[in-house]
Regions:
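N-terminal Rossmann-like dinucleotide-binding module
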Residues: 1-24, 46
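Short, Asp-centered acidic motifs that coordinate Mg2+ and/or phosphate
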Residues: 6, 50, 130
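Beta-loop-alpha module in the N-terminal Rossmann-like domain of NAD(P)-dependent dehydrogenases
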Residues: 26-93
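Rossmann-like NAD(P)(H) cofactor-binding subdomain of soluble oxidoreductases
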Residues: 59, 79, 102-109
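Hydrophobic residues in well-ordered beta-strands that form the structural core
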Residues: 76, 82, 101-103, 132
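Rossmann-fold dehydrogenase core element
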Residues: 89-107, 127-130
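Predominantly a Rossmann-like dinucleotide-binding segment in NAD(P)-dependent oxidoreductases
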Residues: 107-167
């Protein structure tokens, strides 16, 4: 179990403070800059044990790097980074620092995914020769990003989201 005790919840200091207050985070542990948070929390005797990175994809590498260098364990939302070279650099840094780095793959916990994995491992369905997957999510079916919706803006830009959305 984890307790939320600190956070860099927005790059806007007022919004970060308001979000922290809503979540019960002490004002002195509310940050508007992830690098500042990494250094400050690493210096505290009661500093965080781990950070959860749930930023837009293009920020994962920078944020994870700051916390790994500060000696703070990282729980990073998928994808690891927006590019393969960034992922390779991040993996090397995690190995070099020996600081735990874990990548969330949220669907691995779904019963249907676990059952499929079990069936494949046991040979119950034979050799897997082809996999076809559909991910039905209609909120980005139209040009939502044109309305200024923040999530849609970065998720529909391959330069910010990475190329995984196009695979």
């Amino acid at each position: 179990r984890w307790e939320l005790v600190a956070g860099a919840l927005s790059s806007d200091p007022a919004r970060a403070a308001a979000s922290a207050a809503d979540l019960g985070i002490a004002p002195e542990r509310s940050y508007s800059d992830f690098a500042q948070m990494a250094l400050a929390e690493a210096a505290r005797p009661d500093g965080i044990d781990a950070v959860a990175i749930v930023t837009p994809n293009h920020l994962h590498a920078k944020v994870a790097t700051a916390f790994l260098r500060a000696g703070i364990a990282v729980i990073c939302d998928k994808p690891m980074t927006a590019t393969l070279p960034e992922a390779e650099e991040l993996a090397a840094l995690a190995a070099e620092t020996s600081v735990p780095f874990v990548l969330t793959q949220t669907y691995t916990g779904y019963p249907m995914v676990r059952e499929a994995r079990r069936m494949i491992a046991e040979g119950a369905i034979g050799a897997v020769r082809h996999v076809q997957v559909e991910y039905l999510q209609d909120w980005l079916a139209g040009p939502v990003e044109q309305s200024g919706q923040k999530q849609a803006v970065w998720r529909t830009d391959p330069g910010l989201s990475g190329e995984g959305g196009c695979i």
